UniProtKB/Swiss-Prot annotation:
Binding site for S-adenosyl-L-methionine: Q212, F241, E262, N307
Organism (species): Escherichia coli O7:K1 (strain IAI39 / ExPEC)
CDD domains: AdoMet_MTases (cd02440)
Keywords assigned: 4Fe-4S, Iron, Iron-sulfur, Metal-binding, Methyltransferase, rRNA processing, S-adenosyl-L-methionine, Transferase
PANTHER family for this protein: RNA M5U METHYLTRANSFERASE, TRNA (URACIL(54)-C(5))-METHYLTRANSFERASE
The protein's role, per its UniProt record: Catalyzes the formation of 5-methyl-uridine at position 747 (m5U747) in 23S rRNA.
Family: Belongs to the class I-like SAM-binding methyltransferase superfamily. RNA M5U methyltransferase family. RlmC subfamily.
A molecular function GO annotation: rRNA (uridine-C5-)-methyltransferase activity
Protein name listed in UniProt: 23S rRNA (uracil(747)-C(5))-methyltransferase RlmC
GO annotation terms (biological process): rRNA base methylation
Keyword 4Fe-4S: yes
Length: 375
């Protein structure tokens, strides 16, 4: 991938950009095999990759500069701003949105937040695009609601320029820290969720729900999990850390009982909406802590699917799964180090199958799917 920002030394986020994709995949595979070296693995599946540029469905832009000349991008460690509107990881459809947002920031009087001075209002611009219909969700992260009336007044102009903006919100983040969003979300549009579709499964994206940033690879990840589950004798499964339900909705069949657990209520609202659309009546989604839910249950499903954040599932849940002993565990991980640590805490299981998904090209990060079978 060619990147003018990297070549000029202005951005170093894609640390592996000079390596061809096959070399990147080899290095990631070697890293994963090294982390799992202590465990016999029955089957290593070929790694899955997608496009090397224009693949991201989300932009998280720090707003800096002045209200007349805002910059959208990031701050270097020394506080120097960098405009990243030309980042080649973004699809071409993002360019006209960034181009319209800059004059809009001036029109609405949204003074960029100055970290050093602790002054200003507009901290971040968060943009998400649906692959299914090109609809977009735009979030303005503000320090307070001081400029809310001005923003509302100026909004019709922006909507006229960008009819693809289906969901527009303001998020209030009052804390002087590098935290992306606060708890308060104010909707400026009637529509509150963005419609997405992977492998004919309807998915919904709401402002405060996690969604994968590489749709091409994420859809293959979900399809692979579905294929693995269909090969197993499963009538009852749990989907823990389920997010908007991507895994569970792909894996479920009409006669399967499935419970999806996620701590974020916004994500659970999305999952329930999808299940209703699919007419799957035996799916239950609940906004709870996954570890607390699991340890409070009496019955044991045949399969537990876990998709934890980077910290992994942790010893308490590993201990409980070991005691409960479901026949199968599918572990989807964005941090193979913590996954390997968790597998060490599950001595009653063997690794049947592992597959690497290159969700984050040009970086050392990757996603991995692992099938564990009770010994």
């Amino acid at each position: 991938m060619q990147c003018a920002l990297y070549d000029a030394g202005r951005c170093r986020s894609c640390q592996w950009i000079t390596q061809p994709i096959p070399e990147q995949l080899s290095a990631k595979t070697a890293d994963l095999k090294n982390l799992l070296a202590d465990f016999p693995v029955e089957e290593w599946c070929a790694p899955v990759s997608g496009p090397e540029q224009g693949f991201r469905n989300k932009a998280k832009m720090v707003v800096s500069g002045s209200v007349e000349k805002p910059l959208l991008g990031m701050l270097h460690r020394d506080g120097t701003p960098e405009d990243l509107c030309d980042c080649p990881l973004y699809p071409a459809s993002f360019a006209p949105v960034f181009a319209a947002l800059k004059p809009f920031i001036a029109r609405a009087g949204l003074t960029p937040y100055n970290v050093a001075r602790k002054r200003g209002e507009l901290k971040y611009i968060l943009l998400t695009e649906s692959q299914s219909d090109g609809g977009m969700m735009l979030r303005f992260v503000l320090r307070s609601d001081t400029k809310l009336a001005q923003l509302r007044k100026a909004l019709p102009w922006l909507q006229e320029q960008l009819p693809q903006l289906k969901v527009i919100t303001v998020n209030i983040q009052p804390v002087h820290m590098a935290i992306m969003e606060g708890e308060t979300e104010i909707y400026l549009t009637e529509q509150q969720a963005l419609a997405e579709r992977f492998n004919d499964v309807p998915l919904w994206i709401r402002p405060q729900s996690f969604f994968q940033t590489n749709p091409a690879v994420a859809s293959q990840l979900y399809a692979t999990a579905r294929d693995w589950v269909r090969q197993l004798p499963i009538k009852h499964m749990w989907d823990l850390f389920c997010g908007v339900g991507g895994f569970g909705l792909h894996c479920a069949t009409p006669d399967m009982q499935l419970t999806g657990i996620e701590i974020a209520p916004e994500a659970i609202a999305c999952a329930k909406q999808s299940a209703a659309e699919l007419g799957l009546t035996r799916l239950q989604f609940q906004a709870l802590d996954s570890t607390q839910f699991a340890s409070a249950q009496g019955e044991v499903p045949e399969l537990v699917l876990v998709n934890p954040p980077r910290r992994g599932i942790g010893k308490p849940l590993c201990d409980y799964l070991s005691t409960m002993a479901p026949r199968f565990i599918i572990y989807s991980s964005c941090n193979a180090q913590t996954m390997a640590k968790d597998i060490r805490e599950l001595p009653g299981y063997r690794i049947e199958r592992v597959q690497l998904f290159d969700m984050f090209p040009h970086t050392a990060h990757y996603e991995v799917l692992t099938l564990l079978v009770k010994q």
